Amino acid sequence: MRTSQYLLSTLKETPANAEVISHQLMLRAGLVRNLASGLYTWLPTGLRVLKKVEQIVREEMQRAGGNEILMPMVQPADLWQESGRLDDYGPELLRINDRHKRPFVLGPTHEEVVTKLVANELSSYKQLPLNVFQIQSKFRDEIRPRFGVMRGREFLMKDAYSFHLEDECLEKTYQIMFDAYCRIFERLELNFRPVLADTGSIGGEKSHEFHVLADSGEDDIAFSDASDFAANIEKAEALAPAGERAEPTQTLTKVATPNVKSMDDLVQCLSVDLKTTVKTLLVVGATVEGEAETVVALVLRGDHQLNEIKAEHLPQVATPITFASEEQILAAANCNAGSIGPVGLNIEVIVDRSAAHLSDFVCGANEDDAHLTGVNWQRDCNEISVHDIRNVVAGDPSPCGQGNIEIKRGIEVGHIFQLGRKYAEAMNCAVLNEGGKNQTLTMGCYGIGVSRIVAAAIEQNHDKYGIKWPKAIAPFQVAIVPMNMAKSARVKETAEALYESLNQAGIEVLFDDRKERPGVMFADHELMGTPLLLIIGERNLDAQQIELKNRITGEKSLIAIDEVMSLFN
């Protein structure tokens, strides 16, 4: 490809609205352009990268036994009503009507469509197991699209679905797909971690996320410093402290705490360690339809944070988790939110394991501007239940029993689930088993954010000059950069001959035939991340040599013209 025929849209300045480095470089290097909030046009350079990622994903899915299909992006809302997700999915699901006022949705995922397809196409256990996949655009109406294609509203995704008669067969396919995902990210040369994960709105029984480690990641990943254990912080279990709870040594005392509005204020006011305090949060309780709304108290150690996902899994807590209103707080505790405590509460009290291990602790007195010291669970509080409801923190013992927890940021680029029979039961997806009876199928689903991988790769592979692509997904393998070609027939002749040879050999080459200053040309290629530059200058041609520059290492060397082709053998 010649730059004179190529849409090379580089920018010198960083756009003001680009927050993370991948978004900045994708705009500056001319990979994408923003159309509207969360919507991007892929320009030629970006599309070349995207297609290479897509092809690696496709190859590994086929190697894992996947059959490629393509399903409609627009889906009948009736399917989502049938699965029970139409109302549950929330405002991220874009709903539309056709000219006949029939309701449709713009697909954020395709469980319903593929389940209906398989229910209609399969009739016998002899057709199982089946694994199908597609690579297609999805749409999720994110409330705050950000970070460029990392969290856009429209994005390219590979979603695969497997169907099985028995759970044992699902487990085997799940492991095959897990291994395929690892191969994909290894081929992409990404530093990644597979981690245990929550199943979220898709549902299911077992789940792993695949995270590319990067400081710009939106997820916290907890992993052991002594084993292979890794989990999303939403999923990582916080173990109960070792040993027995200490016996009480203090008497229960109420103390004045005027103007205390936060845990930090409390620590300063009473000169206590935050680890010896507890905080009490009131949330809406789970109720049966028609019953009055209730509230539930969640109690954590003062230095710990509530894990909302864990709390939502408790049967006593409404889903999605909703914090109590001021009116509900006053009715339940007779004080403002900053003074709530577990002593004397006449509602259900759920205490985190670490908080339950405390003795002689400090808590709110359920009275404005007052707290209690010397509090002990068995002596001073009504009945409580103890659960793991907090986020793990660095230094916690790993739940695997080996080492301690470390925390790093990650960008989620893949997610696999064992869905079980949730969708198949709802949509009557069954086949005749060996005994001639109808048997509901069990499912797995497996997603990869193809467009997000491009951004994640940049987050891990860049320097102050631009992108440093992994070889497998670089837009071009090499660029020819002739110096002052317009003034030197010899430079032009050498560049043209080299371009022709590389093209004939199937090498992806970008011939920079612009009438530009060398500095501008070098800056553009460094920004775009072209792995190798072949720099042709009049002086080196006297010795039948050209300069070779490696974008990854920064090394420069002279190479004989007739040795150039050997670089790609």
UniProtKB/Swiss-Prot annotation:
Transmembrane segments: none annotated. It holds the Pfam family HGTP_anticodon. GO terms for biological process: prolyl-tRNA aminoacylation. Keywords: Aminoacyl-tRNA synthetase, ATP-binding, Cytoplasm, Ligase, Nucleotide-binding, Protein biosynthesis. InterPro entries: aa-tRNA-synt_IIb (IPR002314), aa-tRNA-synth_II (IPR006195), aa-tRNA-synth_II/BPL/LPL (IPR045864), Anticodon-bd (IPR004154), Anticodon-bd_dom_sf (IPR036621), Pro-tRNA-ligase_IIa (IPR002316), Pro-tRNA-synth_IIa_bac-type (IPR004500), Pro-tRNA-Synthase_IIa_type1 (IPR023717). It is an enzyme of class 6 (ligase). It catalyses: tRNA(Pro) + L-proline + ATP = L-prolyl-tRNA(Pro) + AMP + diphosphate. Homodimer. NCBIfam families: PRK09194.1 (NF006625), proS_fam_II (TIGR00409). Catalyzes the attachment of proline to tRNA(Pro) in a two-step reaction: proline is first activated by ATP to form Pro-AMP and then transferred to the acceptor end of tRNA(Pro). As ProRS can inadvertently accommodate and process non-cognate amino acids such as alanine and cysteine, to avoid such errors it has two additional distinct editing activities against alanine. One activity is designated as 'pretransfer' editing and involves the tRNA(Pro)-independent hydrolysis of activated Ala-AMP. This is Proline--tRNA ligase. The gene is proS.
